[in-house]
Structure formats: C-alpha cells, structure tokens
From Swiss-Prot:
This is Large ribosomal subunit protein uL16. Pfam families: Ribosomal_L16. InterPro entries: Ribosomal_uL16 (IPR047873), Ribosomal_uL16_CS_euk_arc (IPR018255), Ribosomal_uL16_dom (IPR016180), Ribosomal_uL16_euk_arch (IPR001197), Ribosomal_uL16_sf (IPR036920). Gene3D superfamilies: 3.30.60.300, Ribosomal protein L10e/L16 (3.90.1170.10). The lineage of its organism: Eukaryota, Sar, Alveolata, Ciliophora, Intramacronucleata. PROSITE patterns: RIBOSOMAL_L10E.
Length: 215
C-alpha cells in the first residue's frame, strides 16, 4: 500500500500525539537540517529578515518542510552564494500521523477486521501550525532582501493552505526592531549571543533610579 496523500492529514483533529515510550516505532522526520547557509554569522552581519507566515491552522508534514527548505536553500545559493544568508526552519514536526491500513483485494474481508481496532500505526510526522505562525525565516543584508523574498515565495509553493511572505522590521532573528537595536547598541546595552542578543537591564543602587529621585 502506498503513502496516503497529505491532504488526508491537513486538518488538526484531536490532541497532539508526540513520540513517547507509549508511542513507539515512529519513523524519523524527513527534515533533519533546520539551519542552512552561514549559521555562525554574528547578529551584526545580517540585519534584515524575511518570514513565511501561515494564514491557516493546519498540519504540515515533515516531507513538505524538507521540500520547502531545499527549494529556498538552492535558490539562495544560486543567486547570492552560501555565505550571504542564514535560513532557519521555525517549526518542528512533533505530531505523529497514524494510518489504519486496509486491503482492497478480492476476499479482503476474510483477511482483515475492517474498522474493528482502527487506532492505526505510525505513518510519519507533521508540524501543527496556527494562524500567524512563522514557518521559515532568512536573514540577509539589505541588497539581498529581494532574493530572500523570491526564495521564500518558491518555498511557499511546497505547503498546503495559505501563507504569506513578509519583510520584518526586526533586526535579524532578534526581538528588537532595527531602531531599538541601533539605540541600545549606541548605549552599549547589548551583548552578542550568536545570532541573537542579550539586553543589559538597569541594575545598581536605588539612588540611580528616576523613581526614587522624585521621592
């Protein structure tokens, strides 16, 4: 029996069903690489970021995620080289899909029990996404933003449902906008942490705080 089409598993039904000691014999997810390109680039090198954002609540199989990653990665390498971007898959396929195999040959009713005991066995894995979930992100320099948009548009075609490609106002993969990042960097309140940053908070004696100066 061949693999069932992914449209059979597109709608999320029931509770999440992850791999566990009660759920064994699960095949590995097809996607194994979640970061591509120049992964070790510092946060300063790629200030612009483009996302694929989901517009539906659905399940996306690991095969679709891997196909999208390959399409985006190949397009970016072709046009801007492998050292000019950092591509990241933002969702993980934890949910296990099941199949209750049915025979379709003559005399199948003698060989199987039909819908009796129809819980099914593990078939593959899928990621559960909501409206507004970010599926893929790529950070680049300003001249390469148009190539990032084109690459993620090609990757978007590998998914079911509706998605959109958006250019974020954030600095790279951080939670800060580019204006906030520049201001905090000038104030020397940022500590680089790989592709992200840590913000140094206000610490010290209470006399420094504006609130206690007014009392």
């Amino acid at each position: 029996m061949g693999r069932r089409p992914a449209r059979c598993y597109r709608q999320p039904k029931g509770k999440p069903y992850p791999k566990s000691r009660y759920n064994r014999g699960v095949p590995d997810a097809r996607i194994r690489i979640y970061d591509s390109g120049r992964k070790k680039a510092t946060v300063e090198e790629f200030p612009y970021v483009v996302h694929i954002v989901s517009d539906e609540k659905e399940q996306i199989t690991s095969e679709a995620l891997e196909a999208a990653r390959i399409a985006a990665n190949k397009n970016l390498i072709k046009f801007i080289s492998k050292d000019a971007f950092h591509l990241r898959c933002r969702v993980h396929p934890w949910h296990v899909l099941r199949i209750n195999k049915m025979l379709s040959c003559a005399g199948a009713d003698r060989l199987q029990s039909g819908m009796r005991g129809a819980f099914g066995k593990a078939l593959g894995k899928a990621a559960r996404v909501d409206i507004g979930s970010i599926l893929f992100s790529v950070r680049v320099k300003e001249p390469h933003v148009k190539y990032a948009i084109d690459a993620l548009t090609r990757a978007k075609a590998k998914f079911p449902g509706r998605q959109k490609v958006v250019t974020s106002q954030k600095w790279g993969f951080t939670k800060l906008t580019r204006a906030q990042y520049s201001r905090l960097r000038n104030q020397k309140k940022l500590v680089t942490d790989g592709s992200n940053v840590k913000v140094i908070g206000e610490r010290g004696p209470l006399s420094r705080l504006e609130l206690f100066r007014k009392i």
